[in-house]
Design a protein with these regions (language model features):
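Concave beta-strand-loop units of leucine-rich repeat
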Residues: 2-18, 23-63, 69-147, 151-170, ...
Length: 181
C-alpha cells in the first residue's frame, strides 16, 4: 500500500509538521516547503525516507547522504544549493522543476528516471543527460527554450521519452540515433 505524503512547512513565524499520525522512523514520503531557509538536519529523524520533495529554500542538503532508503527526490528550489558533498547511490528518480536547484550533476549517475519541468531559460539538455548513463525514462515538460533534442545515443537503457509543451522544439534528429525501442 502506498503511503500518503507527510508534510513539513516552515514559514517566518513558525512551522508545522504533519506526519499523518506516524512516528518519524515510519515516514516513507515527506514534502518539505520552506518560505524561510530550512536547515534540513531535522531529516536525520526520518531515516527510512524513500521519497522526498524539497520546495523553496533549504540548506544542509548533505544530510540527504544519510537517508539510505531514499530513491525518489523532487526539487523545486527558489535558491540554489551545492550538491557537491551529497552521495545518493540509491537515488533512481529525480524530478527537477525550475532552474534554481543548483548544479545537480552529482545526483545524476545512478538515476533511471529523470523529469525536467518548467525550466524557462534552459536551452541545452546535454548537461543533464551526459552523466545520466543509466537513464531509462526521460520526461521533458514545459521547456520553452529547447529547440533541439541532444544526442541520446549515450543512453543505452533509455526506453521511454515523453515530450510535453516544448513549443520551440523543431529538431528531433537525435531520435534516429537513440536506443529507443
Amino acid at each position: 500500500m502506498e503511503q500518503a505524503y507527510c508534510t513539513a512547512v516552515f514559514w517566518r513565524g513558525g512551522e508545522k509538521i504533519d506526519l499523518n499520525g506516524l512516528k518519524p522512523d515510519a515516514v516513507r514520503c515527506l514534502s518539505v516547503t520552506g518560505e524561510r531557509k530550512v536547515n534540513l538536519s531535522f531529516l536525520r529523524d526520518y531515516p527510512n525516507l524513500e521519497e522526498l520533495t524539497l520546495m523553496e529554500k533549504c540548506e544542509g542538503v548533505e544530510v540527504l547522504s544519510e537517508l539510505k532508503q531514499l530513491h525518489t527526490l523532487s526539487l523545486w528550489l527558489s535558491a540554489p544549493v551545492s550538491w557537491d558533498n551529497v552521495s545518493l547511490p540509491g537515488l533512481r528518480v529525480l524530478h527537477l522543476r525550475g532552474e534554481k536547484n543548483g548544479d545537480i550533476t552529482p545526483l545524476l549517475s545512478s538515476i533511471t528516471n529523470l523529469h525536467l519541468e518548467e525550466m524557462r531559460k534552459t536551452e541545452d539538455l546535454t548537461p543533464f543527460l551526459t552523466p545520466a548513463t543509466r537513464l531509462q525514462k526521460l520526461y521533458l515538460q514545459s521547456l520553452p527554450a529547447v529547440q533541439k533534442l541532444p544526442a541520446l545515443d549515450g543512453l543505452p537503457s533509455l526506453y521511454a521519452l515523453k515530450l510535453y509543451e516544448l513549443h520551440k522544439l523543431s529538431d528531433l534528429s537525435a531520435l534516429s540515433h537513440s536506443h529507443l525501442r
